[in-house]
Amino acid sequence: MMVKNICLACFMVVALVCGRAVNAFPLSNGDQVECHFSHGDKQGVATEIWNTYRQPEERNPELGRAVAVMRLDADGWPTIIIDGEAHKKNAKGSPAIWDFVYFHECAHAQDPSRGEIEANCAAYKEMSRRGLMNFHRMKDLEAVHLSMLMLPEEYGGSGLKLWHKTLECARKGDG
C-alpha cells in the first residue's frame, strides 16, 4: 500500500510539472515562458488558464473585454487567464501584442499591487531584455494603444496617455 501511494504521489508530481511545461506561454520567437513570481509567503509559477470556447457565452466572464487578465485565486495564487480563441485568431498577425499582453499580466502576477501603467512598463522592459522589442514591434504596440480612446483612470484615461506613460516609465527605468 505504501509503495502504491509513493508511486501515485510521484505520478502526480510528474503530471503537475509536465502540465506546467505544456501550458507555458508561446512567445513569438518560439520560446516557451512561464511567469515566475515571489511575494508574501508564496513563490512559484503563476497558473495559466487558456480559455477555449465555441460560443461567446462560454467565454470566461473574468476576461470582460480583455484578451487576458490576472486574478488571485482563493489561496492568493496568481492565475493568468488567456482568451485562447483570440490568441488562435490573432497571434500570427500581431505577435508583439501577445508577447506584451503576457508580460503585462505576468507583471501583475509578480506584484498584484502593481498598477496598469507599471505593468505596461514592466512588459515593455521584459520584451526589450529578451530582444523582442524593435522599432516595428514598438509601433505595433503603439498603434494598439492609440486605438483605445477611452480607458478607466487607472490606465491613464486613454490609450494615448497609457502609451505615453509606459514609454516615459521604460525610459526612466521605473516599474
Residue ranges and their predicted role:
Residues 21-65:
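A metal-dependent hydrolase signature that marks the N-terminal structural subdomain at the beginning
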Residues 55-98, 106-109:
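Active-site scaffold of zinc-dependent metalloenzymes
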Residues 34-36, 120-122, 168-170:
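Sequence contexts marking disulfide-bonded cysteines in secreted/extracellular proteins
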